[in-house]
From Swiss-Prot:
It comes from Cytophaga hutchinsonii (strain ATCC 33406 / DSM 1761 / CIP 103989 / NBRC 15051 / NCIMB 9469 / D465). This is D-Ala-D/L-Ala epimerase. The keyword Membrane does not apply. The lineage of its organism: Bacteria, Pseudomonadati, Bacteroidota, Cytophagia, Cytophagales. Its EC number is 5.1.1.-. Keywords: Isomerase, Magnesium, Metal-binding. Binds 1 Mg(2+) ion per subunit. GO terms for molecular function: magnesium ion binding; racemase and epimerase activity; racemase and epimerase activity, acting on amino acids and derivatives. Part of a large, functionally divergent protein family. Protein modeling and substrate docking were used to predict the substrate specificity, prior to biochemical analysis.
Length: 368
C-alpha cells in the first residue's frame, strides 16, 4: 500500500442560502478534496473545509500547503498513519484543516485494506442512533423564528441556533424561536466566540427559562480561562468548540474544569488520529462529546459519522451542512433519513467518493 500519487482539487460549492454566524457570512463552501492513490490501485478520499477566522486557512492556502504534504507522503505506506501524521507536522506547523483531509484519506485506505467499514476499523459499533440537528443562521429574530418553524416542518427535532450579538437581540431571537417552534424541539445555541465574559453570563442567565441544551464557545477562545467563571455563574452547560482543537487543548480544559462537553471536528484536530485522543480524554473525564464539522460535503461528514460510532461518550451530532448545498457532488456516503437520523455506510473504508463529472470540472493538481 505504497502511496504513488496524490490529487488535490479546489471544490467551491454554492449554498442554498448564505450561512451567517457571528464570525462572518459565507455563500459558498470553499473546500479542498484529496485523493491518494496507491501502488495496489486503491484510492483514498479526504476533504476539508477551511475557515480563515477559525483555522487561519483558506481554500487557496490549503491547496498550496497540500502540495508540500503530498510530496512528503509519496513513497510512504498509507498504513503508517501515525508516522505520516508526524511527517506532515514536520513538513509544516499548524494547517490542521488540510492535514485532516490527508489523514481521512489515509484512514479510508487503511480500512479498505482491512476490508472493514471505517467505524469498525476504528473499533466502533453501530449501537446507537445518530440524529443530527439543523442550524438556524444568525439573522433578525422574526426571520430566525420562521426558519425554525420550517426546520421543524421538515422533520428535524433538534435545532441549533447561531447567536453571539447583543444581549437583548440574542434573548429576543431565542424567545421568538422557542415560541414559534414549541417546547418539543430541542434547542442548542452557538455563540461562535461572539460575547464578552460579562455579556455571556448575562445572556445565558436570561436564556435559562428557554430550556437550552448547551451553549457552544460563548467567548473568544483566547479567554478559555474565563470559561470556569461562566460555567459556575450559569446553569446552561458550556461546550468548548474553537478552544478545543487538539488533545492538549482538551486536557487543559479538563484540568481547569472549563466546560461540560467538547465539540469535536476533524479539521480542528488535523484528522481522526488526534480526534481519537480527544475522545479518550473525554471518556476518562466522563464528559459528553459532540461531533460536527464546518461546511464539508457528505464525504467529510461521512468520515465524522464513522468517528461518531467509536464511543458512547459521543452523544450529540451536528451534521447538517451538506443539506445546505445547492448540489450534492458525493456518491455513496451517509444517508439522511427522517427526523435527521443518519445511516452510515457498510462499505469497506469510508464508503464515499465523488462523482467523476464533478471532479472533472474542478481546478486540480497531481503530485507523483
Amino acid at each position: 500500500m505504497i502511496i504513488t500519487q496524490v490529487e488535490l482539487y479546489k471544490s467551491p460549492v454554492k449554498l442554498k442560502e448564505p450561512f451567517k454566524i457571528s464570525l462572518g457570512i459565507l455563500t459558498h463552501a470553499n473546500n479542498v478534496i484529496v485523493r491518494i492513490h496507491t501502488a495496489s490501485g486503491h484510492i483514498g478520499y479526504g476533504e476539508c473545509s477551511p475557515f480563515m477566522t477559525i483555522h487561519g486557512e483558506s481554500m487557496d492556502t490549503a491547496f498550496i500547503v497540500g502540495q508540500y504534504l503530498a510530496k512528503g507522503l509519496i513513497g510512504t505506506s498509507c498504513l503508517d498513519i501515525v508516522s505520516n501524521s508526524l511527517l506532515m507536522d514536520a513538513i509544516i506547523y499548524g494547517n490542521s484543516c488540510i492535514k485532516s483531509a490527508f489523514n481521512i484519506a489515509l484512514y479510508d485506505l487503511a480500512a479498505q485494506h482491512a476490508g472493514l467499514p471505517l467505524y469498525a476499523f476504528l473499533g466502533g459499533k453501530k449501537d446507537k442512533i445518530i440524529q443530527t440537528d439543523y442550524t438556524v443562521s444568525i439573522d433578525e429574530p422574526h426571520k430566525m423564528a420562521a426558519d425554525a418553524v420550517q426546520i421543524k416542518k421538515n422533520g428535524f427535532e433538534i435545532i441549533k441556533v447561531k447567536v453571539g450579538g447583543s444581549k437583548e437581540l440574542d434573548v429576543e431571537r431565542i424567545r421568538m424561536i422557542r415560541e414559534a417552534a414549541g417546547d418539543s424541539i430541542t434547542l442548542r445555541i452557538d455563540a461562535n466566540q461572539g460575547w464578552s465574559v460579562e455579556t455571556a453570563i448575562e445572556t445565558l442567565t436570561l436564556l435559562e427559562p428557554y430550556n437550552i441544551q448547551h451553549c457552544e464557545e460563548p467567548v473568544s477562545r483566547n479567554l478559555y480561562t474565563a470559561l470556569p467563571k461562566i460555567r459556575q455563574a450559569c446553569r446552561i452547560p458550556i461546550m468548548a468548540d474553537e478552544s478545543c482543537c487538539n488533545s492538549f487543548d482538551a486536557e487543559r480544559l479538563i484540568q481547569i474544569q472549563a466546560c461540560d462537553s467538547f465539540n469535536l471536528k476533524l479539521s480542528k484536530s488535523a484528522g481522526i488520529t488526534n480526534a481519537l485522543n480527544i475522545i479518550r480524554l473525554a471518556e476518562q473525564a466522563h464528559m459528553p462529546v459532540q461531533v460536527g464539522g464546518f461546511l464539508e460535503s457528505r464525504l467529510g461528514f461521512t468520515a465524522a459519522a464513522h468517528v461518531a460510532l467509536v464511543s458512547k461518550t459521543i452523544c450529540y451530532y451536528d451534521f447538517d451542512t451538506p443539506l445546505m448545498f445547492e448540489a450534492d457532488p458525493v456518491r455513496g456516503g451517509i444517508v439522511y433519513q427522517q427526523r435527521g437520523i443518519i445511516e452510515v455506510p457498510e462499505t469497506a473504508g469510508l464508503g464515499a467518493g465523488y462523482q467523476k463529472d464533478y471532479l472533472s470540472g474542478l481546478e486540480k493538481i497531481c503530485i507523483n
